[in-house]
């Protein structure tokens, strides 16, 4: 699964996800993409599950690009532990996804296969998404 090799700090504040995506809202690599339409934290496991669903439907044809990276550490305390005594340990890594962000791109397959693959991948994600197609400009 995806996670940073090293970070400046081990733990982060939760924070909020405000506004629209400032970058990564255009198709840069493939002809079809999966665009988020709402803000959410997407875990590394969810990204991996979506990637597997997409590549499995494409049957190793074409190419997949993952455009989000889980760089936010999410902490949790063990079960049945009293409050206090410091922040919990890092449980998993997540990516903060803003509305408009392209999460996955694919290319090298027909439009019907691409749409179905992205639909299956979108089912694994906690965000509302829409499929975008590169217009030939």
UniProtKB/Swiss-Prot annotation:
Coiled-coil residue spans: none
GO biological process entries: translation
GO molecular function: rRNA binding; structural constituent of ribosome; tRNA binding
Keywords associated with the record: Ribonucleoprotein, Ribosomal protein, RNA-binding, rRNA-binding, tRNA-binding
GO cellular component annotations of the record: cytosolic large ribosomal subunit
A Pfam family annotated for this UniProt entry: Ribosomal_L16
PROSITE patterns according to UniProt: RIBOSOMAL_L16_1, RIBOSOMAL_L16_2
Subunit structure: Part of the 50S ribosomal subunit.
Function according to Swiss-Prot or TrEMBL: Binds 23S rRNA and is also seen to make contacts with the A and possibly P site tRNAs.
Family (UniProt): Belongs to the universal ribosomal protein uL16 family.
NCBIfam families: rplP_bact (TIGR01164)
PANTHER family with a match to the protein in the record: 50S/60S RIBOSOMAL PROTEIN L16, LARGE RIBOSOMAL SUBUNIT PROTEIN UL16M
Name assigned to this protein: Large ribosomal subunit protein uL16
Source organism of this protein record: Cereibacter sphaeroides (strain ATCC 17023 / DSM 158 / JCM 6121 / CCUG 31486 / LMG 2827 / NBRC 12203 / NCIMB 8253 / ATH 2.4.1.) (Rhodobacter sphaeroides)
Upper classification of the organism: Bacteria, Pseudomonadati, Pseudomonadota, Alphaproteobacteria, Rhodobacterales
Gene, per the UniProt record: rplP
């Amino acid at each position: 699964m995806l996670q940073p090799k090293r970070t400046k700090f081990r733990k982060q504040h939760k924070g909020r996800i405000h506004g629209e995506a400032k970058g990564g809202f255009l198709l840069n690599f493939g002809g079809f993409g999966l665009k988020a339409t709402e803000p959410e934290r997407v875990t590394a496991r969810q990204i991996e599950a979506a990637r597997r669903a997409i590549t499995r439907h494409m049957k190793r044809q074409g190419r997949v690009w993952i455009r989000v990276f889980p760089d936010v550490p999410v902490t949790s305390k063990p079960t049945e532990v009293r409050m206090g005594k410091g922040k919990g340990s890092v449980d998993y890594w997540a990516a903060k996804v803003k509305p408009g962000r392209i999460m996955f791109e694919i290319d090298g397959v027909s439009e019907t296969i691409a749409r179905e693959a992205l639909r299956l991948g979108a089912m694994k994600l906690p965000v509302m998404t829409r499929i975008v197609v590169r217009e030939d400009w």
